[in-house]
C-alpha cells in the first residue's frame, strides 16, 4: 500500500525515506494534513506491527493504537503484555445505539403483541356483550308480546261488555215494545192514534190488511166499464169477480138441499 505523498515528503526531508515515488500525473486537490491524528514517527520508532498505527485522540489528549485492517483500537501498545483490543468508542456508541433501537423495536413488537392479545381477549367480551344484548332484546320482545296479549285480552273484554250492553239494550227495547203493544192506548204515536180513533170500525182497513180508502173510493169513474165486478175487493178469494145473481144463489141452495135429502 503506497504512503501518502505528504508523508513521503516529510520522511524524505528527515532522511528516513530515500526513494520518492513519482507523483501521479492526474491533478490532485491540495489537502491539509496538519490535523492528521496519526503519529507516523512514533509508529516507526516503536516498531509497531504492520497495519498498526499510533493515533492521537484530540478529545482526551491521549494516544491510542489503531489497526487499520480490523478497525480495532487499544490504549496499550501491541508489544505490551497487558495489550487488549476492542472496538472504538464511536463504534461502540453506534452498536449501542443499534442495540437500543433493536431493543426498542423488540419492545414495540412486544407491546403490539400485547395489544393484539388484549384485543383478542376483548373479542370474547364483545361476544358476551352481544349475547347479553340479544338476551335483553329477547326479553323486551317477550314483554312486548305479553303486553300485546294483555291488550288483546282487554279488547276482547271490552267487546264482550259492548255485546252484553247491546243485548241488554235490545232486551230492554223488546220489553218496552211489548208493554206498548199490551197497552190499550199507545202513548208514543199521538198523531196516528188520533187517526185510528177517527177510523170507522166497519172499514175493512181497520180489521184487515186492506188499504184505507178515501172519500172517492168506490165511486164510479169516468170512462169505466160497468162489469158488475167489485173493484174494491182484494185478495185471492175474490180477485175482483162479479157477485152471482140472487136467482143463481137460490138455485144453488136448492140443488144442495136435494143432494142432502137423497143422501
Swiss-Prot record:
Segments for region (3 X 2 AA tandem repeats of [DE]-R): 139-144
Modified residues (Phosphoserine): 245
Main location: nucleus
Keywords in alphabetical order: Immunity, Innate immunity, mRNA processing, mRNA splicing, Nucleus, Phosphoprotein, Repeat, Transcription, Transcription regulation
GO molecular function annotations of the record: double-stranded DNA binding; GTPase binding; ribonucleoprotein complex binding
Cell compartments where the protein resides: Nucleus; Nucleus speckle; Cytoplasmic granule
Repeat region (Sequence), residues: 104-110, 111-117, 118-124, 125-131, 132-138, 139-140, 141-142, 143-144, 150-151, 152-153, 154-155, 156-157, 158-159, 160-161
Record's compositionally biased regions (Basic and acidic residues): 99-173
Record region (Disordered): 94-263
A Gene Ontology biological process term: positive regulation of defense response to virus by host
Coiled-coil ranges (or none): none
A cellular component term, taken from the record's GO annotations: cytoplasm
InterPro entries: WW_dom, WW_dom_sf
Residue ranges, annotated region (6 X 2 AA tandem repeats of [DE]-R): 150-161
Domain WW per the UniProt entry, residue ranges: 46-80
Chain positions covered by the region annotation 5 X 7 AA approximate tandem repeats of D-R-[NS]-H-E-K-S: 104-138
Region (Important for interaction with TXNL4A): 243-253
The record's note on its domains: The WW domain may play a role as a transcriptional activator directly or via association with the transcription machinery. The WW domain mediates interaction with WBP11, ATN1, SF3B1 and the C-terminal domain of the RNA polymerase II large subunit.
Role noted for this protein: Intrinsically disordered protein that acts as a scaffold, and which is involved in different processes, such as pre-mRNA splicing, transcription regulation, innate immunity and neuron development. Interacts with splicing-related factors via the intrinsically disordered region and regulates alternative splicing of target pre-mRNA species. May suppress the ability of POU3F2 to transactivate the DRD1 gene in a POU3F2 dependent manner. Can activate transcription directly or via association with the transcription machinery. May be involved in ATXN1 mutant-induced cell death.
Subunit text: Interacts with POU3F2/Brn-2, ATXN1, TXNL4A, HTT and AR. Interaction with ATXN1 correlates positively with the length of the polyglutamine tract. Interacts with RNA polymerase II large subunit in a phosphorylation-dependent manner. Forms a ternary complex with ATXN1 mutant and phosphorylated RNA polymerase II. Interacts (via C-terminus) with TXNL4A and CD2BP2. Interacts (via WW domain) with ATN1 and SF3B1, and may interact with additional splice factors. Interacts (via WW domain) with WBP11; Leading to reduce interaction between PQBP1 and TXNL4A. Interacts with CAPRIN1. Interacts with DDX1.
Protein name, as recorded: Polyglutamine-binding protein 1
Source organism: Rattus norvegicus (Rat)
Amino acid at each position: 500500500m503506497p504512503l501518502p505523498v505528504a508523508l513521503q515528503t516529510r520522511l524524505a526531508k528527515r532522511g528516513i525515506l530515500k526513494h520518492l515515488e513519482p507523483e501521479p500525473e492526474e491533478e490532485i486537490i491540495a489537502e491539509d494534513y496538519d490535523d492528521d491524528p496519526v503519529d507516523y514517527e512514533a509508529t516507526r520508532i516503536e516498531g509497531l506491527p504492520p497495519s498498526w498505527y499510533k493515533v492521537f485522540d484530540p478529545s482526551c489528549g491521549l494516544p491510542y493504537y489503531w489497526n487499520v485492517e480490523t478497525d480495532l483500537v487499544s490504549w496499550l501498545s501491541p508489544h505490551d503484555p497487558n495489550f487488549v483490543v476492542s472496538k472504538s468508542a464511536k463504534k461502540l456508541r453506534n452498536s449501542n445505539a443499534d442495540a437500543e433501537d433493536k431493543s426498542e423495536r423488540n419492545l414495540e413488537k412486544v407491546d403490539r403483541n400485547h395489544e393484539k392479545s388484549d384485543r383478542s381477549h376483548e373479542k370474547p367480551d364483545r361476544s358476551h356483550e352481544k349475547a347479553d344484548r340479544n338476551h335483553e332484546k329477547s326479553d323486551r320482545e317477550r314483554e312486548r308480546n305479553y303486553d300485546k296479549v294483555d291488550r288483546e285480552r282487554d279488547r276482547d273484554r271490552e267487546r264482550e261488555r259492548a255485546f252484553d250492553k247491546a243485548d241488554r239494550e235490545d232486551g230492554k227495547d223488546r220489553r218496552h215494545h211489548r208493554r206498548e203493544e199490551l197497552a190499550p192506548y199507545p202513548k208514543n204515536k199521538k198523531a196516528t192514534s188520533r187517526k185510528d180513533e177517527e177510523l170507522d170500525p166497519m172499514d175493512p182497513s181497520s180489521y184487515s190488511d186492506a188499504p184505507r180508502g178515501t172519500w172517492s173510493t168506490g165511486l164510479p169513474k169516468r170512462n169505466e166499464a160497468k162489469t158488475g165486478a167489485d173493484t174494491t175487493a182484494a185478495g185471492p178469494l175474490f180477485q175482483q169477480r162479479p157477485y152471482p145473481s140472487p136467482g143463481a144463489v137460490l138455485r144453488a141452495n136448492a140443488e144442495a138441499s136435494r143432494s142432502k135429502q137423497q143422501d
